[in-house]
Amino acid sequence: MSFSVNQPFRWMDSGTYQDSPLEPLIRDEALAASMQSESAAPVIHLWVYDQALYLGRRDAKLPHLQQALHQFGQDGFGCVLRSSGGACVPLDAGVLNMACLLPNTSISIDSFFSFVAQLLDVGLRDYGKLEFGEVTGSYCAGEYDFSIHGKKIGGMAQRRTRHGSILQLCINVDDRPRGEWMEHFYRLAGLDEMQSHKPIPSIDASTVGSIASLTGKLATMDDVKARLLETIRSEWAVSPTPFYVQNELVTESRHHLSQRLHLFSYTAKELAAPDWHLPE
């Protein structure tokens, strides 16, 4: 592999979010902005959101998106339009999100994906052998999916900012009906009614799994976090650090995502309101 990290990673965990689903993405964006500092070091940021649909740009083309989101709001899901990745991913208390941030914009797309795939291969080796490549029929399917025994447990997406590179991924830790949720969501949103130019292929719930369901091992969020840190530290320099990012960068990032990129975000309560509607 043509890329390596010469500085220790700062390992940060900002915990579990339940308010606006945009908040953890704002923290990722603020950390990306912090890469402009001359003393910037690479960061691995962990977080959990309980629970929401993290939509991609392609989902905006669905004919009944508003009705589907309203129904999911009544079922306890918030939603957010995210800036990376192509289609919807369901997040809940059993999904671990991880962002890898580098003060480096010159790394190639493939090299960054390959590097993080190595991190995951080492970090999750106690749970079995990971396979990388598209899992056809899974939600948000793409060539940077990762799976165990052919069933998707997560996926990766990356982008560049002015000051660095950011790769975001999620890992299904415990067993919940995420594939069924996505089948239901796309049915409500009218995917099957679209005769041509479908923005998303059909979803097959059986293609999705989790660490717990596919390995038969006890897999709690705390256990997976601890094993990730322990095994990754065996191969790379990693320094656990309390989560911190400058308030000014958080404010700027909130404005950038919501006002400049027009990423909408709603809690379940907001989505469930009778008068709720998508922004024009």
From Swiss-Prot:
One of its GO terms (biological process) is protein modification process. Pathway: Protein modification; protein lipoylation via endogenous pathway; protein N(6)-(lipoyl)lysine from octanoyl-[acyl-carrier-protein]. CDD domains: LplA. Its EC number is 2.3.1.204. Disulfide bonds: none annotated. The active site is at residue 140. Keywords: Acyltransferase, Transferase. The keyword Ligase does not apply. It comes from the Bacteria. It is an enzyme of class 2 (transferase). InterPro entries: aa-tRNA-synth_II/BPL/LPL (IPR045864), BPL_LPL_catalytic (IPR004143), LipL (IPR024897), Octanoyltrans_LipM/LipL (IPR050664). Belongs to the octanoyltransferase LipL family. This is Octanoyl-[GcvH]:protein N-octanoyltransferase. It comes from Brevibacillus brevis (strain 47 / JCM 6285 / NBRC 100599).
